[in-house]
Amino acid sequence: MELNDANLQTLTEFLRKTLDPDPTVRRPAEKFLESVEGNQNYPLLLLTLLEKSQDNVIRVCAAVTFKNYIKRNWRIVEDEPNKISDPDRTAVKANIVNLMLSSPEQIQKQLSDAISIIGREDFPQKWPDLLTEMVARFRSGDFHIINGVLRTAHSLFKRYRHEFKSNELWSEIKLVLDTFALPLTELFKATIELCQTHATDVNALKVLFSSLTLIAKLFYSLNFQDLPEFFEDNMETWMTNFHGLLTLDNKLLQTDDEEEAGLLELLKSQICDNAALYAQKYDEEFQPYLPRFVTAIWNLLVSTGQEVKYDLLVSNAIQFLASVCERPHYKHLFEDQNTLTSICEKVIVPNMEFRSADEEAFEDNSEEYIRRDLEGSDIDTRRRAACDLVRGLCKFFEGPVTAIFSGYVNSMLSEYAKNPRENWKHKDAAIYLVTSLASKAQTQKHGITQANELVNLTEFFVNHILPDLKSPNVNEFPVLKADAIKYVMIFRSQLPKEQLLQAVPLLITHLQAESTVEHTYAAHALERLFTMRGPNNATLITAAEMAPFTEQLLNNLFKALAFPGSAENEYIMKAIMRSFSLLQESIVPYIPTLIGQLTHKLLQVSKNPSKPHFNHYLFESLCLSVRITCKANPTTVSSFEEALFPVFTEILQNDVQEFLPYVFQVMSLLLEIHSNSIPASYMALFPHLLQPVLWERTGNIPPLVRLLQAYLEKGGETIARSAADKIPGLLGVFQKLIASKANDHQGFYLLNSIIEHMPPESLTQYRKQIFILLFQRLQSSKTTKFIKSFLVFVNLYCVKYGAIALQEIFDSIQPKMFGMVLEKIVIPEVQKVSGPVEKKICAVGITKVLTECPAMMDTEYTKLWTPLLQALIGLFELPEDDSIPDDEHFIDIEDTPGYQTAFSQLAFAGKKEHDPIGDAVGNPKILLAQSLHKLSTACPGRVPSMLSTSLNAEALQFLQGYLQAATVQLV
């Protein structure tokens, strides 16, 4: 694509169409942009547009498109073509910093993100001048430019907060500190001075305080891994100024907005974080500054209002106290009973109150409320911080703290009892306090795993939780009902089973509550209870115990999906999945009705997939319906196909990328249930599964391979007979997969199925080429994973076609190649093979080579006979060799910044491990003994003499054991 006006005009038109709300206009435009993004100059055209377009909407759209393009394509993935040409990469890096700094803020943010994505891959090795170019801009004096640099540096360095320690990381941070720490400190001091100079200029202060907040964030990132020497030497400068900013109160920066945090709050919040970091990690060095920070933060807490805009500040300030009170160093600051009472009264109790803003969120923004309350994204909430402070104080002062709080809990509950309708918030706070007091350790999987023994959880449940759950009107006091459900959920591991069983029917009833939070919590609580393990590793609650409630449970769960706002509620769908899994065959009578509801739901969500978790659990539930019903009666598979295929066809035709991996897995499950034949409906689809475009998406590969394996297993003969022209396409897929280090094992899965299930004559013309391709890959990049898969394939080929055929095909490629493969690959590497089925295949294959291949007994290959036998005995007896060569590159596809739909494995579409040898060989050691016996009777004297001259004593001893077990001997 040339950099010319015509192309800029075309790009402008298509970008405008991507903003169209009409999908018939928007989708073709998105497809067009996708089709041209591989062309050279495409990123430069976007950068030109965002710089020069007259239309601001197009500029912003170009910036967002550019950022997403970089996110998808910048990383160079091994084995895949470079998606951005080298000249484009160089040009982007040469221009982007300048462009970002001269752009308006809306565009600056997008380009700043793009720089950090590029930096994640290229900095520092491939972009060594990035930092010096950025630091040079500090001298510009223009705070629009300076803030652009700071914002970019923040997005570049914030990963230091969660990276694992490594030499590479240390050297990168050292480089950053050497270049950046001093200019940042100078900028910090200069900005503080400018704040004093412009103390009465509100516009200047807004810009300067934005800078200070970014500087404080950078301080946190650069100090997170370890205390750098530079910052230790300059601690006085940083801490004195941080303390000054913490105690600053500039009326000009106060906002009237009750919701949105202002610049002053954001800066103070970050300073609290920085102080907490130093108090936790560098307490010795920070000790001289700690008392004044404790005083400043305490004063801040007791003087800050209850408005939402202060939430982040208050929660960070409380988190600071929580991190301080947990350290033995600072224990003395909290020992006094009056101090504990004061903290409880002035900090903890006020911040546990359920405010009108919380009530609003509960009713009108339930999704966000649930996300915060259930999923632990409540890190920045006052309640969560107050809860953490209670836990921190209990570490050293459990007795006194429990006594103080028990008094508060009792008085709150008695206030509630006087007038429940008016005072229900008192009970809410009491439940929250009890929860914080009682929780010592918690996990997602088990809820509270360690509780404060001074709190009687069962008594509290019976007296204060059960009455709310039993109340006949599920829509009355929804917040207290949600609290009660949550109590059951988080203390499930602490409450006795009989109380959990008492709660189950009550929770089922609460699925009918109109409140989204309430019916979501009920679904989540049931799902968690159904996963609890009892004795013997079985589920704690059994299908038999659920029998009286099964119908109501299923009805209420599906009805709950009809509530406004819960049409794609992931908690309800997960509870449906878990109920199916627990109830097993008890659900069969209901499936004819439920499958219709599930497929209807699938059709709806496939129009615009937006809730990945919901969609995943929906497909899991479909798999369970199929597995459970067909286990009882395999012929019902056709009724599932009738229900599902119309929806699947629509998903395939509309190329709903997110759903294709799921559809392929469910189809595999259905096809695997058929007895040995392929229905015509599947054969019609077969050619489409070989289309290269499907195989370009990483997420499709594992499920597509499994689906093709199912085709081969059920209809290798049919494919050879009626679709022989598709065999080259099938082998083309194998060829593509084998060339990739990330997917070569999938190529072998496919190849092994082809060898196992296709009639031998249908492959005659292709066999030699298959081996040549494998050797080419061995020469170009030999990884441990590839060799293990190669060994399994070679031995499977031997089992299927015989040892002579294996030797002949190797030697037809190149004379004496069979010996080279044995000597260089099989003998030294076979011990790396892992997995019982894989080891069995190798053992049977090698046994055949040893005992059924004449060339091993009377040619130059004979010298390899004993080493090969020794290697086989090693495979049986030695521990698996899991060593990996030092220089081997690990393919990391987990954190690709621009990943395609990752493969989502459906747990309930699980495939049984297939053993191609099956019962034909029970014990490979016995097979070896019997085969050696047979060989020795055919050529008497040869085998014992080869063993006695060159097999080591330990291996010989093991072999004697096999012969005895098989009751045979060598002659």
Swiss-Prot record:
Q: Which domain of life is it from?
A: Eukaryota
One GO term describing the cellular component: cytosol
**Subcellular location field:** Cytoplasm; Nucleus
Q: What is its main location?
A: cytoplasm
Q: Which InterPro entries match?
A: ARM-like, ARM-type_fold, Importin-beta_N, XPO2_C, XPO2_central
In the record, biological process GO terms are: protein export from nucleus; protein import into nucleus
Q: What PROSITE patterns does UniProt report for this protein, alphabetically?
A: IMPORTIN_B_NT (PS50166)
Reply yes or no: does the keyword Cytoplasm apply.
yes
- Known Pfam families for this protein? CAS_CSE1 (PF03378), Cse1 (PF08506), IBN_N (PF03810)
Q: Which residues form the Importin N-terminal domain?
A: 29-102
Arranged from A to Z, the UniProt key words for this protein are: Cytoplasm, Nucleus, Protein transport, Transport
GO terms assigned for molecular function: nuclear export signal receptor activity; small GTPase binding
- Kindly state the subunit structure of this protein: Interacts with cftr.
Which family is annotated? Belongs to the XPO2/CSE1 family.
Chain's role? Export receptor for importin alpha. Mediates importin-alpha re-export from the nucleus to the cytoplasm after import substrates have been released into the nucleoplasm. Negatively regulates fluid secretion and plays a role in fluid homeostasis by down-regulating cftr activity.
**PANTHER family tied to this protein:** EXPORTIN-2, IMPORTIN-7, 8, 11
Protein name, per record:
Exportin-2
Gene for this protein? Answer: cse1l
